[in-house]
Structure formats: C-alpha cells, structure tokens
Amino acid sequence: MSSSDPNLRGSARREFLWQCSAAVASGLAVGAAASAGDQPAAGELPTIQLGKHRVSRMIAGWNPIGGYSYMGHHMDQHMREYYTPERTVEFLQGCEQQGVNTHQYSPSDKSTEVLRAMRERGSKMQFLCLSSGRAQVKATIEATAPFAIAHHGGATDTMFAAGKSGEVHDFVKEVHDRGLLAGV
C-alpha cells in the first residue's frame, strides 16, 4: 500500500491521536499525583487570605442577580424577574454548598433582603460589597454588614479619567476608618 491509500492515512492518524491522548493522560496522572498535597480536600475550593478572612477563589457575583447582562435591557429585565430574593437566596445557598464562601454584591434593597435571609438561615457566607458612593458607606455597613467594600471598577476608571482620584482615595479611607477591608 502506498502512503496515498486513504485507509492507511486514517489509520496512521488514529494511531497518532491515540498515542498523544495516552501521553497526555499519563502526564496528567503524574502531575495530579505530584501535586495532590497542594490541593484542597475533596469538595473544598482553593482560598486566599484577605485580612482575617479566608475567601474562596471563586465568588458568587452580583451581575446576574442585579440584572446586568450586558446583552440589552430585555435580558436585564428577564434576569431581574428571575432572580427574586427567594431564588437569589437559593442560588447563594447552592453556591455555599459547593464551597463558594463569598458573595460580592452591590448595595440595594434586594441585596439587603437577601443577605438578611442568608444570615437568618444560618449561612456562613461572607459578603463583599462593591460600591462607589462615599456617602453611602455607613448606611451600607449598617444594612448589610460586609467584611469589605471595594470601589466599583467602572466608577474608579471614570473618576480617574476625570482627575478625581482623590475621591477614590477618600472612599477607601472612609471604609478603612469604619474598620473594614477596602479595595479598588
């Protein structure tokens, strides 16, 4: 048979792919065995330290819950209708059961209701607020008791572009002065 025989070419390709997949699989097995001591226990997610808090490296975000799809106002509305406070609590409880221990939210009546319900149901989830209004820092802390407040990135960019970086600094200082972790 010549190398132009389609049966031979297909067979050679299959053999090559089989050898590659076997090599990859054995390499993955060796790598997994070598780093098994570095991995969290089954069912746990990796975490990082933020101050005195252990935060899962995956956090539950606010955009879908708050109705921010970046796909237009119709999708935003559908998301807001779907993520009722009760569904949001169920979603966050499911996240917590899977090892996600932190929820990043924006201040709103809905988030206040959801965080209160989570705590009433015994959740150990930690709450990280994303905000930009210095005037609302105290009220946000009183209403939702986050462990940290970060200045919203889009607002930060806008303020820096307008030469108002001092306002971002003042926001961070306000959060720190109230005893919370602060970020930008």
Where in this protein do the model-derived segments appear?
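N-terminal secretory signal peptides
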Residues: 1-12
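N-terminal twin-arginine translocation
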Residues: 10-15, 26-43
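Conserved, mostly hydrophobic/aromatic
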Residues: 60, 182
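Active-site mouth loops of central-metabolism enzymes
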Residues: 71-85, 127-133, 158-161
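Catalytic domains of carbohydrate-active enzymes, especially glycoside hydrolases
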Residues: 86-108, 144-147
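Active-site-adjacent beta->alpha loops and helix N-cap segments on the catalytic face
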Residues: 108-118, 157-171
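Acidic (Asp/Glu)-rich catalytic clusters
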Residues: 115-123, 138-146
